[in-house]
């Protein structure tokens, strides 16, 4: 399972993590990256994510870590309450959500991540980190142009 954290201002990947897929790995990796990014910080962060992150435990852990969850809501039930969805920033995050997945799509189509030939978490993790760095380098000319 591959995860990455991204800066919303410029869309560059700032952190990666590869874990064993077990149904909870993405959420655990996201929490680990948040705690590594700002350990003990009281500055409010925002996390934008897809529907797979909409579960009560994950949202509770985010709120305890001073992170606002801008997670896409599940249709039948959602852990995201009305105070979050009514905020104008939530609507903006939902529109920008597509940008989160673009580097992962690039890694699978242009980069070598569609079917890796490596085995082991460390090796695949190194390949994934290198691929995300290449994705950032590919985006830089467009960012510098304006």
What are these regions (language model features)?
Residues 1-146:
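Anion-binding and metal-coordination hotspots
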